Amino acid sequence: MHTLLAFIFAILILVSLHEFGHYIVARLCGVKVVRFSVGFGKPFFTRKRGDTEWCLAPIPLGGYVKMVDTREGEVSEADLPYAFDKQHPAKRIAIVAAGPLTNLALAVLLYGLSFSFGVTELRPYVGTVEPDTIAARAGFQSGDKIQSVNGTPVADWGSAQTEIVLNLEAGKVAVGVQTASGAQTVRTIDAAGTPEAGKIAKNQGYIGLMPFKITTVAGGVEKGSPAEKAGLKPGDRLTAADGKPIASWQEWANLTRQSPGKKITLNYERAGQTHTADIRPDTVEQSDHTLIGRVGLRPQPDRAWDAQIRRSYRPSVVRAFGMGWEKTVSHSWTTLKFFGKLISGNASVSHISGPLTIADIAGQSAELGLQSYLEFLALVSISLGVLNLLPVPVLDGGHLVFYTAEWIRGKPLGERVQNIGLRFGLALMMLMMAVAFFNDVTRLLG
C-alpha cells in the first residue's frame, strides 16, 4: 500500500504539472480547452469550471488536455478563432513544448528543494571489489579513485557508475583511475555481449564495485537466524572458518553462500577473547532454482574510510537551486545519450523500466525520507520531459517537428505523411511499452 500511494502521488504530481504546462500556455495563446484529465479511462471525478471540464480517471499512466480542434470534430463558428489547429505554428509549438519544459523546470525546483536541506556526496573511490565480477576481472583495486570513463571526467560516485553502465554494452570501457599509491592507470572493462552485461539493468547498475569498505566485524545479527542461534552478536570479529583465516567479508559471504545446510566451524573474537561456534546456513532457493546458504549476518562498514569518501554540507538556497539546474542538465544529457545508444544498438532494452519498477522505486525512495523522494520525483520528471521531447510522432516532440516544418514551409505537411508518421510513432511507443512491461515482470520474478 505504501508503494502504491507513493507511485500514485508521483503520477498525480508529474502528470498534472505536465498537462498544466500545456493548459496554461494554451489559455495564454487564446485556445479553448475543453477537458483537462489526469489518468486515462472513464473519469470517476469531474468538475466544470468555465469552459474546461477537470477530470480524474482510473488508469494513472498519463493524462491529456483536450482543446477545441476542427480535426477532431465539428466546431461551432463562434469557437473557430479559439481552435488549436487554427493558431499560428509558433503558438502551437509553444503549447506543445510547454508540457515537457514544465517537467524539466519542475526537476530543477525539486532538486533545489532537496539540496537546500543538505547534500551528501560520495567521492569516486573504490572501497570494495567483489570477487569474480566484471569489476574484479577489469583489475579494480580497493583505494582506486575513478577520474574518468571513456575520457569523460567524473566528480562523484554516482556519475562514475552512470557513465560506466551507459558505455558497458557499447564495447570496451576505459576507466581512468588513480591507484591507492598515487599512480595513474586505466582499468579496461570488456564485458559487451556477455551474459553478465545483460544482467546489469536488473542489478541496478551493479558491476561488483562498492564505494564503501566493509570489515570482518558483524554489524547486525538477524533474529532467529543461524548466526543468532550460534550465539553471535554485533561487534564480533570473524577470524577463521573451518580452520582457514578470513581475510575479508567477501570470503565469508562466498563460503556461506556455497554451503547451504552444511556445518561451518567459525572462530571469532569478542572483547579480546577467541570463541568458536558451529553454524549451519539456512538453505535458500533463488529464482533460477539454485540453492545458496544464508546465516543472517550483516557486516560493519569501515567508519574511517566512510568519513574519507563522504562529504556532507548544506549549500545556500541560491546555490542549492543552481545545483538543481546543473543536476537537471546532467541527467537530461545522460537520458539523451541513453536513447542514442538504444537506437544505435549500443545499449540494451533491458534498461527500460515500466510502471511496476517505477512504483517499486517510488516506495523505496519514500521510505528513505523526503529528500530521497523529492530526488526520485525530479529524476522521473526529467525522464518524462526528455522522452516527450523526442522527435517521435504521437509524442510532443513529434508534433513539434510537424509544426516547425509547417512554419518553415508555409503550409502543413501532407496528411498522408502525417498519418504514416503517427502510425509509426504509435507502433514504436506500443513496442516500447511492451518491452517496459516485460522488463518489469522479469525483474519482479527475479
UniProtKB/Swiss-Prot annotation:
GO terms for molecular function: metal ion binding; metalloendopeptidase activity. This is Putative zinc metalloprotease NMB0183. Keywords: Cell inner membrane, Cell membrane, Hydrolase, Membrane, Metal-binding, Metalloprotease, Protease, Transmembrane, Transmembrane helix, Zinc. The active site is at residue 19. Its EC number is 3.4.24.-. Residues 100-181 form the PDZ domain. GO terms for cellular component: plasma membrane. SMART domains: PDZ. The chain crosses the membrane at residues 93-115, 376-398, 419-438. PANTHER family: MEMBRANE METALLOPROTEASE ARASP2, CHLOROPLASTIC-RELATED, REGULATOR OF SIGMA-E PROTEASE RSEP. Zn(2+) binds at residues 18, 22. Pfam families: PDZ_6, Peptidase_M50. Its main location: membrane.
